[in-house]
């Protein structure tokens, strides 16, 4: 039984407004092969960066509430700790203001992210001065802050120096849409990922069984292209991704990889095998599937997947279509 998935192009991919002004799912089949149509990508990759500059160091003015709470820094009482962390809330985004902490001339704080978008203090409308608040920085070093993913179930309390690193890999952080491309901005808990795919990405075909054939059509399309298919077996769902991109100037390559709709710990229970077979030739790749928490971008960047160029693809292709045998096994 064969299902087809046709090519399509991938479309390219505010702090408080008042403050700124003052500054899978498709058909489920029981067949053994599915056809994935291409999604062409017109967007490039981008990176963002930021910088912060430390201004004048002074014994900064602090509000009376800050002063009255300083003696409690480092205390063990949970309620008092919560009171202290509330002093660090940014009045614009309600995230925490962490060192280096800058204040306005009246002692009001705002986080670095929002500060870059403002022309005046969101609290008093006074000028934003580059004044370091050393007293609040000292308090911050003795306070434990909740993980920003606490709403998703994380119970960690962290000193500010460990907060960013923890949050980047927190197991409770929301899952992003696993589909290639930057057009879908959905994020949410793991148990809603499949529901999202079924509702918002209905063109993706799902095949049942641990052995299937992933048939990518029109592999000779120019530009950046991707093919996606779902595979369901062992009570889990796997997403098969084939991307064609120009990783080096003038040299297009194919990257094939499998990711589990699940956590990294769950992914450790499986191994996947990709095989190109035909014309008395065979090309194989075997590895642990990626968790969708990790995504596939870093694996593709590091070539930690099945990689082959367009000339190799032509050795296995039939009239512009490429079949990849996919096998999922329990470890």
Swiss-Prot record:
Keyword Cytoplasm (UniProt): yes
Q: List the disulfide bonds.
A: none
Q: Where are the zinc fingers (RING-type)?
A: 90-125
The record's keywords, sorted A to Z, are: Cytoplasm, Developmental protein, Metal-binding, Nucleus, Sensory transduction, Transferase, Ubl conjugation pathway, Vision, Zinc, Zinc-finger
* Zinc finger motifs (SIAH-type), residue ranges: 142-202
What domain notes does the record hold? The RING-type zinc finger domain is essential for ubiquitin ligase activity.
Question: What Gene Ontology terms describe what this protein does at the molecular function level?
Answer: identical protein binding; ubiquitin conjugating enzyme binding; ubiquitin protein ligase activity; zinc ion binding
* Pfam families on file: Sina_RING, Sina_TRAF, Sina_ZnF
Assembly, in brief, is: Component of some E3 complex at least composed of sina, ebi and phyl. Interacts with eff.
Q: Identify the stretch(es) annotated as Disordered.
A: 32-72
UniProt subcellular location: Cytoplasm; Nucleus
Write the protein's name.
E3 ubiquitin-protein ligase sina
